[in-house]
Amino acid sequence: MKICGITDVETAKSACEYGADALGFVFAESKREITPKRAEEIIQELPANVLKIGVFVNESVEVIQKIADECGLTHVQLHGDEDNYQIRRLNIPSIKSLGVTSESDMKNAQGYEADYILFDSPKEKFHGGNGKTFSWELLRDMPKELRKKMILAGGLNALNIEEAIRTVRPYMVDVSSGVETEGKKDVEKIKQFIIKAKECSK
């Protein structure tokens, strides 16, 4: 599971201790935006086996690659209108994020060459992290090959994660606002989310 929108080392370390597989750092306009320098400082304190994912929105490949190299990112998440041309130019594993409004979004996802596909709620002011779910039923009949690399996001929290995993059976789940209190990451909510997610993934 991925905890996204990390901005401080204490929360990052706690998430890793509780069993997070990946942490997300947002390098785009967001309530959780972080500078490359701050992200690098946090990443240096993290276990080697935890994935460090940088989130970008319509950024140039050159800037993405520069930040990835400087910070020590293991993956980049493309949360804007990026296409396969940009994906191919990256020399780091990629995640393409798509907003879901209908079954056709799932079909369109199969055309992307990213290593993983992240299904999220439709974008609003910010791309992602809006705390809203979408109809998981739209993803129920996903092809097996797509499901193997599918990440589920969008309004997940400790109360709905069990239903989400049972319905969609994703490769990974991604949470941000669902583990926050008054806009700040809440380590107790992170702990409860991870416990619930691991329970229903057994």
UniProtKB/Swiss-Prot annotation:
Its EC number is 5.3.1.24. Pfam families: PRAI (PF00697). InterPro entries: Aldolase_TIM, PRAI_dom, RibuloseP-bd_barrel, TrpF_fam. GO terms for biological process: L-tryptophan biosynthetic process. Pathway: Amino-acid biosynthesis; L-tryptophan biosynthesis; L-tryptophan from chorismate: step 3/5. It catalyses: N-(5-phospho-beta-D-ribosyl)anthranilate = 1-(2-carboxyphenylamino)-1-deoxy-D-ribulose 5-phosphate. It is an enzyme of class 5 (isomerase). Keywords: Amino-acid biosynthesis, Aromatic amino acid biosynthesis, Isomerase, Tryptophan biosynthesis. SUPFAM superfamilies: Ribulose-phoshate binding barrel. One of its GO terms (molecular function) is phosphoribosylanthranilate isomerase activity. It comes from the Bacteria. NCBIfam families: PRK01222.1-3. Belongs to the TrpF family. This is N-(5'-phosphoribosyl)anthranilate isomerase. It comes from Bacillus cereus (strain ATCC 14579 / DSM 31 / CCUG 7414 / JCM 2152 / NBRC 15305 / NCIMB 9373 / NCTC 2599 / NRRL B-3711).
